[in-house]
């Protein structure tokens, strides 16, 4: 059951614009920066960030797509023959010596980010890995912190954060739901 909308379309747009500026400022430009979105919604957020960065800097930043299914320690979705459902990684550039900015919709326990870092390290040796998330809801199980956060939304363990994006859900909003 939905309790409250915490970010609407305009608030999401503002948060992503701010994150884009923070990425540029922290990295003193975008040279050697690449964005890698974590499937599924992180990919669309990474593409939106890339558009904003290009508008601000006048240069394109490469964007990749990361499927972390095989790196997770809590596989849940399996195919009929009990194998993990893999959607595919598409990182069409070398990450070696790059500043990799992982992009995801929600930071919760940190397990997704840990799996994403493992997947990135299998692609090469980045100079640095940074993390950008639309929502940080707390409840970390691993010592992981986002470098760029759209909004901190403290939640209870009985609540869910639901991120809906136009590309997947036909609307942009973040809401809190009761489990």
Curated annotation (Swiss-Prot):
It is an enzyme of class 2 (transferase). InterPro entries: PRibTrfase_dom (IPR000836), PRTase-like (IPR029057), PyrR (IPR023050), PyrR_bifunctional (IPR050137). It catalyses: UMP + diphosphate = 5-phospho-alpha-D-ribose 1-diphosphate + uracil. Keywords: Glycosyltransferase, RNA-binding, Transcription, Transcription regulation, Transcription termination, Transferase. The keyword ATP-binding does not apply. A motif (PRPP-binding) lies at residues 100-112. Regulates transcriptional attenuation of the pyrimidine nucleotide (pyr) operon by binding in a uridine-dependent manner to specific sites on pyr mRNA. This disrupts an antiterminator hairpin in the RNA and favors formation of a downstream transcription terminator, leading to a reduced expression of downstream genes. Also displays a weak uracil phosphoribosyltransferase activity which is not physiologically significant. This is Bifunctional protein PyrR. The lineage of its organism: Bacteria, Bacillati, Bacillota, Bacilli, Bacillales.
């Amino acid at each position: 059951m939905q309790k409250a909308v915490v970010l609407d379309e305009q608030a999401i747009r503002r948060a992503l614009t701010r994150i884009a500026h923070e990425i540029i400022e922290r990295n003193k430009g975008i040279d050697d920066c690449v964005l890698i979105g974590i499937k599924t919604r992180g990919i669309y957020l990474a593409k939106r960030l890339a558009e904003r960065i290009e508008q601000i800097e006048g240069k394109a930043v490469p964007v990749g797509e990361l499927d972390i299914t095989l790196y997770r320690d809590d596989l849940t979705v399996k195919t009929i023959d009990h194998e993990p459902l893999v959607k595919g990684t598409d990182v069409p550039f070398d990450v070696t010596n790059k500043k990799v900015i992982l992009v995801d919709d929600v930071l919760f326990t940190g397990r997704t980010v840990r799996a994403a870092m493992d997947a990135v390290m299998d692609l090469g040796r980045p100079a640095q890995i940074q993390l950008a998330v639309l929502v940080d809801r707390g409840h970390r199980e691993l010592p992981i912190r986002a470098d760029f956060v759209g909004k901190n939304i403290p939640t209870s363990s009985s609540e869910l954060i639901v991120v809906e994006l136009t590309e997947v859900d036909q609307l942009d909003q973040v809401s809190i739901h009761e489990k």
